[in-house]
Amino acid sequence: FLAEVVTKEDTVVDATMGNGHDTLFLAKLAKQVYAFDIQEQAVEKTRQRLAEAGLDNAQLILAGHETLDQYLDHFKAAIFNLGYLPSADKSVITRPDTTLEALEKVCLGLEKGGRAAIMIYYGHEGGEVEKDAVLDFVSQLPQQEFTVALYKTINQINNPPFLVMIEKLKEK
């Protein structure tokens, strides 16, 4: 979904750095990646992963994704993995208030034709509230400006994660 639109000329956002898999994926595609996380462990793991791949086109930022507008104002793509960092403290989770603030800024900052991918893990405490908040937010985006799609499995148990995809059709 993102690889279809991101080129070596583009700047992109990894809103939830985590273990650095998405940052690495984006760094291979884009000119510049801005990656955010509130956990030092995430920054270190990601720095190591990028170094092993020989990539240096990512700015790793120890801050919440809601601060992204302090670092850049327009970009081609953004990715979120909502939930918690699997190998870390499971009480440190993404929260609806900061996630919605970040999503608003992403919708403003996306270039025309730009895309955002939001993977929602919600089987943990607080996850259901964030899931509902995100779905409510994206369902209210104006259809003249955005296309929003949902990709989910329907025959899996135990709260399987699902993907929300946003494409910006035009500037305001």
Question: Where do the protein language model's features map onto the residues?
Answer:
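S-adenosyl-L-methionine
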Residues: F1-T11, H21, E44-H74
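Helix-to-beta-strand junctions that scaffold the AdoMet/dcAdoMet cofactor pocket
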Residues: T7, L55, L110-K112
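Conserved SAM-binding loop of SAM-dependent methyltransferases across substrates and taxa
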Residues: N19-K31
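Conserved SAM-binding motif I beta-strand of class I
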Residues: Q32-D37
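Mobile active-site "lid"/loop adjacent to the S-adenosyl-L-methionine
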Residues: G83-E101
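Conserved beta-strand signature within the Rossmann-like core of class I S-adenosyl-L-methionine
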Residues: G109, G113-I120
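Class I S-adenosyl-L-methionine
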Residues: G127-K172
